[in-house]
């Protein structure tokens, strides 16, 4: 019988969740849903010194906003609770002791000063990587070098100690990664990692392996930065005798800077003017409020689609996928090895596509919510007409107000550069003449307005394209905007006449 798919997203609550972490959560989620498996949220808070208040709730809120819903976790519970590692502390102790008894780990009593002296000694000897390993452990203060009676006495006396993994000397660790294929590592390059700290709390390495075993995790899908830790984790599985139930490893390619060189960081995001966090983060240390993708106006479904394609390819030309379609198409085999450039323009494109696919009724909420705040009167039909006009240019929900407010509020300023280029004496006189015929246009709709304007200009041998920018400046204050005739129809006959007359009164023709 094939092993059930059970995957976990296991972030540490040490600050705001990076967008790369969201992609990791998403890939785990997609694999679980694809195979009717279980997606687990486990909080890895073994490093209490780095714990940041609010970070755990931030992780929960992020997944909730994106619809990446855990089947088991700190809120949902489940058959392998608790799902917070600090609540599992006593259990890790038992497994650490088991390794010591099996000769796979040992007690180490070295003080920070002694550890520093060891590193200095190795550096002086020109050792490339000064570390606590199979060679240096021989002259350190641990249960491999001290008599058993002394070890027992030190422990009974309450002397601080850690439990270290006894790294095999000069062996080859081979394991298969679903993305990278076979990986080989020489153990002489690895150190004797601490498994249990002096405060009795397990380190990430021990807790991670024990929990993955106990929670029956089938696949460990995580970032490439954890690849160097994989050999130790393989050796821990072997030390416990758990090789037969060891999960498959999947190390995801890193997200690169927009330029393509180096790992994406908050500094890079700030430099290019885009967020690095999924939702807003209030830094408890500094009080700084940092906006996330949500606050910038990215739709959760668009962000999911964008992130899914950062490292995974469905094959073919299709780019737009609902979450359900992603589940159906997803496979580990199509995850690439190479780092992926974080292209914010592509993220914007996805957001734009998802907005365009919404109905005018759905989009109108983005506009009417702002109108309601400002107590500006409108009709439902009017709001939907405006959204239909604006949607092709909108990238974010807030664009519907930013581009739609001009339909309700006359411009208070006019584009000086556009005036300098367009507002000649002839244009001024022509506009004044057009204003005079506006009251006669009936019905007052885009087609009639355009026809009347064309006839009016034809009599004066003026091209319509010469006057359109002038009318737009008078009506909206700028030369950019949605279809002009439809805009005039929505703004209405009376308000259009008022705006054009105001502009004629305020704007002085060039050269006058």
From Swiss-Prot:
Positions occupied by motif 'HIGH' region: 11-21
Short sequence motif 'KMSKS' region: positions: 263-267
Keyword Acyltransferase appears in the UniProt entry: no
Superkingdom of origin organism: Bacteria
Biological processes, Gene Ontology terms: glutamyl-tRNA aminoacylation
Enzyme class at the top of the EC tree: ligase
Gene Ontology MF, one: zinc ion binding
Subcellular compartments: Cytoplasm
EC number(s) reported in the record: 6.1.1.17
UniProt key word Lyase: no
Listed GO CC annotations: cytosol
Subunit structure: Monomer.
Summary of the function given for this chain in its UniProt record: Catalyzes the attachment of glutamate to tRNA(Glu) in a two-step reaction: glutamate is first activated by ATP to form Glu-AMP and then transferred to the acceptor end of tRNA(Glu).
NCBIfam families found in the cross-reference section: gltX_bact (TIGR00464)
Protein's name according to its UniProt entry: Glutamate--tRNA ligase
């Amino acid at each position: 019988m094939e092993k059930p798919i059970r995957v976990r997203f296991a972030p540490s609550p040490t600050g705001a969740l990076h967008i790369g972490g969201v992609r990791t959560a998403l890939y785990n989620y997609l694999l679980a849903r694809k195979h009717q498996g279980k997606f687990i949220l486990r909080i890895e808070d073994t490093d209490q010194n780095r714990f940041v208040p609010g970070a755990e709730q931030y992780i929960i809120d992020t997944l909730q906003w994106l619809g990446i819903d855990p089947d088991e976790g700190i809120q949902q519970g489940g058959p392998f609770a608790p799902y917070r590692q600090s609540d599992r502390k006593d259990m890790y102790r038992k497994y650490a002791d088991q390794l010591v008894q099996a000769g796979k780990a040992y007690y180490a009593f070295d003080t920070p000063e002694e550890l520093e002296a060891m590193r200095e000694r190795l550096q002086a000897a020109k050792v490339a990587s000064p570390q606590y390993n199979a060679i240096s452990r021989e002259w350190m203060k641990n249960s491999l070098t001290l008599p058993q009676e002394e070890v027992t006495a030190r422990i009974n006396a309450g002397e601080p100690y850690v439990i270290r993994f006894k790294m095999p000397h000069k062996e080859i660790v081979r394991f298969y990664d679903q993305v990278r294929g076979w990986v080989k590592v020489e153990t002489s390059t690895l150190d004797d990692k601490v498994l249990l700290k002096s405060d009795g709390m397990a380190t990430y390495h021990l807790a991670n392996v024990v929990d993955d075993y106990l929670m029956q995790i089938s696949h460990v899908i995580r970032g490439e930065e954890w690849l160097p830790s994989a050999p130790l984790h393989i050796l821990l599985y072997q030390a416990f005798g758990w090789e037969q139930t060891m999960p498959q490893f999947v190390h995801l390619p890193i997200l690169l800077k927009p330029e393509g060189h180096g790992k994406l960081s908050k500094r890079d995001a700030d430099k290019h003017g885009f967020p690095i966090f999924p939702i807003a983060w209030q830094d408890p240390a500094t009080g700084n409020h940092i906006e996330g993708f949500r606050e910038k106006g990215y739709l959760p479904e668009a962000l999911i689609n964008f992130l899914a394609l950062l490292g995974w390819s469905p094959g073919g030309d299709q780019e737009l996928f609902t979450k359900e379609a992603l589940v159906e198409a997803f496979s580990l085999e199509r995850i690439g090895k190479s780092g992926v450039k974080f292209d914010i323009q592509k993220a914007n494109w996805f957001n734009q596509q998802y907005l365009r696919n919404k109905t005018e009724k759905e989009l109108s909420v983005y506009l009417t919510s702002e109108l309601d705040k400002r107590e500006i009167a409108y009709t439902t039909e009017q709001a939907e007409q405006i959204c239909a006009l604006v949607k092709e240019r909108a990238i974010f929900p807030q664009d519907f107000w930013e581009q739609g407010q001009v339909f309700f509020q006359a411009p208070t300023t006019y584009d000086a550069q556009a005036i300098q280029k367009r507002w000649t004496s002839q244009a001024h006189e022509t506009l004044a003449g057009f204003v005079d015929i506006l009251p006669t246009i009936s019905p007052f709709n885009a087609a009639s307005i355009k026809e009347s304007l064309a006839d009016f200009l034809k009599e004066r041998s003026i091209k319509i394209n010469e006057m359109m920018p002038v009318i737009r400046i008078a009506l909206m204050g700028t030369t950019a905007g949605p279809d002009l005739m439809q805009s005039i129809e929505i703004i209405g006959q009376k308000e259009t006449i008022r705006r054009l007359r105001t502009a004629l009164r305020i704007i002085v023709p060039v050269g006058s």
